[in-house]
Amino acid sequence: MNLEKLSKPELLTLFSILEGELEARDLVIEALKAQHRDTFIEERYGKYNISDPLMALQRDFETLKEKNDGEKQPVCTNPLSILKVVMKQCKNMQERMLSQLAAAESRHRKVILDLEEERQRHAQDTAEGDDVTYMLEKERERLTQQLEFEKSQVKKFEKEQKKLSSQLEEERSRHKQLSSMLVLECKKATNKAAEEGQKAGELSLKLEKEKSRVSKLEEELAAERKRGLQTEAQVEKQLSEFDIEREQLRAKLNREENRTKTLKEEMESLKKIVKDLEASHQHSSPNEQLKKPVTVSKGTATEPLMLMSVFCQTESFPAERTHGSNIAKMTNTGLPGPATPAYSYAKTNGHCDPEIQTTRELTAGNNVENQVPPREKSVALAQEKPVENGGCPVGIETPVPMPSPLPSSGSSLSPSSTASSSLTSSPCSSPVLTKRLLGSSASSPGYQSSYQVGINQRFHAARHKFQSQADQDQQASGLQSPPSRDLSPTLIDNSAAKQLARNTVTQVLSRFTSQQGPIKPVSPNSSPFGTDYRNLANTANPRGDTSHSPTPGKVSSPLSPLSPGIKSPTIPRAERGNPPPIPPKKPGLTPSPSATTPLTKTHSQAASLTTAEDLASSCSSNTVVANGKDVELLLPTSS
């Protein structure tokens, strides 16, 4: 098949077939991702079991030990492999575009050759004009001779016409006699025709009676058929309503099951936390008050060492609130509290609660007034402080002793680099990469090579491009209702494919620049990739973030193509209360293929959405304060 000679309808048909194949490929990819969730988690987290809190503690211990003993094989996959895949895809696209460009150039050359031939032909026509006039003169002379010959022929024909006219008169007389005879025969035939007409009238009356009876029977048959179609349509409408209600109830049941599952897991984690808190309070001794403090740059004051242990992959927000209120009471009443709190934060990915962190700063401010450690020890301990799982990156600076304590309202973190914030907000960031990034930023902050400058220029160009596209998508989605899952057979919007490509390139660029790019201060309201999609997702969902339990409106699957915190643009009619539209009924006793296709699609979409909810139930969303803004992180919980 020659692609250059295809017509417009054939090209449209070919494009529609290719688009259908692409959509089918995307569906197959999503199904395979949903099936290989366990293998994906095994590749991502290596040998550790994420459902066991003891294994999580062992992982953290090995991470801390790895800093002193030497480098080990990282747990996460190498982001360079992802970058190589992206570069390979770009090369394939470049080759394809080059082939299309070559085809366009060949067509262009062909058109140019055709135009050149037309110009040469026109030049030949103008050159042959004189020859044409000469030929016309010759033709004129020939025609004049032929005209004279035709005149002589006309004279001959006139003579023959006179002879024929005389013969015609004789024939006319004979025809008159024959016509008189024919008139008599015609009168006889008219009489017979009148008799036959009377007979035909009688037969037509009988035919009209039979037709009227047949029309009545047809009307009765049509009425019966219409009643049958109406009853069939009502039955199909009821069946479709029952199917829709069944899917809605099934989705609601799945959501309730996921919610009860997460609540049970949180209850178990809360019980474990309460037991551990009681055990830690019993084993705590007064000697713990003499521990060495660690100074961390928060405003202009120092604070003691605050260790955060990742006890479980779920968090206990009410317990932390209660303990934070107890510490606040101890600070307000002036009672001497312990220098290092005995409780451990059960946080996922190193998430720091702002209210608890403010209370911790108040306690640290009161302790700084009583005991001021030596400068060398505070600096040494500040450099050895780990960043837990890439959460709450705090810039380490030289402590400045201040006589006044911290104000109760001032809870600000020192600004970190753009690379560290992007690494922290990345869903596949590891504590090893975070510590290496902080160490490199502290050791050589002013180093910047020409290669890194080129990378940063490309990074900012991609950033401005995605920012303009995100603004357009935001304006288009602002006119719609709040996003949630849809169970009706609706078409998938192409913005999901755009968002998938945008997030893939954004994650690759963020990882690449977080390892090699220089450190730059970032304003609190800015995002390293233009528009902050996580904040947009938070504004789209006005519910508070006080509850860290995964809910269907906030938790996204780790296998989702969208970035963390961004939900699908589809809107569920099940949550709005409006049922999806009933497929149009076509006349006929058998159901048409177009009426059965949406129902099949609805079942497949419901199954895929149920799988997505199961994946979403195994994740918990947290908020990490990085560069003065909230960043949502997702981690699978114990299942």
UniProtKB/Swiss-Prot annotation:
Give a yes or no for keyword Cytoplasm in this entry.
yes
Residues with the Phosphothreonine modification: 570, 590
Q: Which GO terms describe its molecular function?
A: protein phosphatase 2A binding
Q: Please name one Pfam family that this protein belongs to.
A: CortBP2
Q: Which GO terms describe its cellular component?
A: cytoplasm; FAR/SIN/STRIPAK complex; lamellipodium; stress fiber
Q: Locate the compositionally biased regions of type Low complexity.
A: 407-430, 467-477, 587-600
Instruction: Identify the main location.
Output: other
Annotated keywords: Cell projection, Coiled coil, Cytoplasm, Cytoskeleton, Phosphoprotein
On this chain, the residues bearing Phosphoserine are: 284-285, 481, 488, 523, 527, 560, 563, 568, 592
Q: Where is the composition biased (Polar residues)?
A: 511-529
Q: Where in the cell is it found?
A: Cell projection, Lamellipodium; Cytoplasm, Cytoskeleton, Stress fiber
Where do the coiled-coil regions begin and end? 87-285
Q: Where is this region: Disordered?
A: 387-430, 463-490, 511-609
> What is the stated purpose of this protein?
Regulates lamellipodial actin dynamics in a CTTN-dependent manner. Associates with core striatin-interacting phosphatase and kinase (STRIPAK) complex to form CTTNBP2NL-STRIPAK complexes. STRIPAK complexes have critical roles in protein (de)phosphorylation and are regulators of multiple signaling pathways including Hippo, MAPK, nuclear receptor and cytoskeleton remodeling. Different types of STRIPAK complexes are involved in a variety of biological processes such as cell growth, differentiation, apoptosis, metabolism and immune regulation.
Subunit structure of this chain's protein: Interacts with CTTN/cortactin; this interaction may redistribute CTTN to stress fibers. May form homomers. Associates with the core of STRIPAK complexes composed of PP2A catalytic and scaffolding subunits, the striatins (PP2A regulatory subunits), the striatin-associated proteins MOB4, STRIP1 and STRIP2, PDCD10 and members of the STE20 kinases, such as STK24 and STK26.
Name of the featured protein: CTTNBP2 N-terminal-like protein
* Organism listed in the record: Pongo abelii (Sumatran orangutan)
